[in-house]
Amino acid sequence: MAIGEVYETYDAVGLAELVQRREVTPKELLDEALARVEALNPQLNAVVMLEEGVARRLIEEGLPEGPLKGVPFLLKDLGAEAIDFPSNNGSRLFANTRYGKDSSIYARLKAAGLVTFGRTTSPEGGVGPTTEAAVYGGPTRNPWNLDHTSGGSSGGAGAAVAAGIIPAAHGSDGGGSVRIPASSCGLFGFKATRARLPDGPYVGEGWAGMAIDGFLTRSVRDTAVLLDATHGPDLGAPYVAPPLEGTFLGALAPCERRLRVGFATTTLTGEPIHPECRAAVEKAARLLESFGHIVEEALPHADTPGMMAAWTKIVACGSALSLDGTVRRRGRPLEEGEVEPIALSAAAYGRTISGAEYLESINKVHAYGREMAAFFERYDILLTATLAEPPALIGRFNHTSDDYVDYRMGPGRVFAYSPFTAAFNASGQPAASVPLHWTADGLPVGIHLAAAYGHDEMLLGLCARFEEAAPWFQRRPPVTLQAVRS
């Protein structure tokens, strides 16, 4: 089989099946992925810190007999600590950081048989809806339109998967960082219930429990298999998610249950959204009705502005901890240009927040979760857009601002652009971005679905129903290997 001719026609599960049937080898898949990096990355700036030698050694030593044996894979350059894969964490300050132990999430991905060969770009500190970190020498671009962002903070993962370099990639999500790139790049992105995936051993929880690992994929079943391979608490986890009824893959089977769906064509606080985003929500609502579900307009009665202010404080405290801890450990102050202005501003703001204010912010986030839970007493699903606009132009959300609070909460800034996703990091509920709509200019627009805490399986099954009714897998962006070679 000439794998290069058909590589993009398979998802990760499909490629693993080819390996299992010995129609292709892991080495051939790795060679193809590396060739695609060489051909496409100069335009996208999505893949960094290649470790080809490590990947070839993994294959030569014998891959585990996991469900994704032989499939090429990339880790986000933020978290997913691994002995064989140093990281920059999106920052010059942390460039080429090495680890003495594999993180639990990477150990499970490795056991699944994946062949990791590098990392994907992330904004510094994972803060922002775009990926334009100085450490990478330029922005990461969207394969659907190179003038637009691929999203953030898992923007490199989104661009790499959308362009067909790999079928699936690791990401993480503390305020929408899997779902925003999914919406921006025409992919599926799922944020699981809080603590569904392991955080250890390097942290007990990320951003007071708001952050979690995840994946960018072109098919719902790839996400299901990746979740099945990685979910569950690791040693010493401070708390665990509610148990599953079965498996994530099993949850994709048809379900006859009639759901009650609330939907909004505005933000959670009633502001208008872009007409293309509104059109995506209306299309999804019609599809849900055609599935036989009860669909009506509804908004949660929750203090979203208060949650956003609390989120902003918690993340700022995390920035201060990260920067100050690094300076203390190395024994010398920051040098000019080591850290971008927005991260410096976030850390400075974090230092002004007292311990009592930090705990008050956590209490606010928890109260918000209870307010959202009340909505899900009546409804099974909340449908909105993923973003309030189509993917932003490069430069709009770069990290040159020295006012972190305005960057997050000012008019037209991050929370105005992405007013939905962080709500479910705060509440801990499962949520997903589904690629249901494209603008007249050919830019992807995702719809956002959220379910009650712990109801991951029901939500994933509904996403699979959308995939069946409105397939997106064969939609390919202008920047692909075929386009580059033609």
Model regions: which residues?
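Short glycine/serine-rich loop segments
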Residues: 99-234, 425-446
